[in-house]
Amino acid sequence: MARMKARSAKGKRVAKDTWKSKVWYNIYTPQSFGGDVIGQTPANDPSALMGRISEISLRDLTNEHSKHMTRMYFKVDGVSGNNAITQFVGHDTTREYLKSQIRRRRSKINVIIDVRTKDGFKVRVKALVLTAVRARDYHKTEIRVKMEQIIKEMANETAFAEFVHAMVMGGVGSKIYSECKKMFPLKRVEIFKSEVLEFGKAVLEVTPEAQEAVEGEEKQ
């Protein structure tokens, strides 16, 4: 019995610790979002990083506390040395925040529209208008048509990075508010979600910080 136990212990395979072989990579936002490090991620091989999505709040990205409810998503689409370069792929707004904005005796008008930017990016945009008082159906229809028109025009007239900035920082919402309040009293406008459906004329953005890090590694 003792011999059998000894043989069993001797023949047992030792599991390889793959975690120790992983390399940590810095995750950078695109240059249009500051080119900052937003986190780190491990991988056995650089190719394993491609397509990984990182999330960060817009508050942490811009240092604006009022943007705490917005989450930004960036996908790795290139690796330079130990640095992962990303592309913006969408944003959303927390459910808790959206629910807190809805009140009784107000109307909620939703719009979902696919638009294309000047440089060929196709983006799905979800917008919300809250009226100050309850609106009739024909008012809702008029506002919805105007919302779609404004979002489409702003996308068609601007490059992708500029349009994304206008979506998440309030430019698109402000334009909708100023135009639609002429039609009916409004309380709030939110561009609460976006998703990049097709990428256009994108150039891989190696940030200055990432380039410096790579050059430093090459000198060592």
Swiss-Prot record:
GO terms for molecular function: structural constituent of ribosome. PROSITE patterns: RIBOSOMAL_S3AE. One of its GO terms (biological process) is translation. Keywords: Ribonucleoprotein, Ribosomal protein. GO terms for cellular component: ribonucleoprotein complex; ribosome. Disulfide bonds: none annotated. Belongs to the eukaryotic ribosomal protein eS1 family. NCBIfam families: PRK04057.1. This is Small ribosomal subunit protein eS1. It comes from Methanococcus vannielii (strain ATCC 35089 / DSM 1224 / JCM 13029 / OCM 148 / SB). The gene is rps3ae.
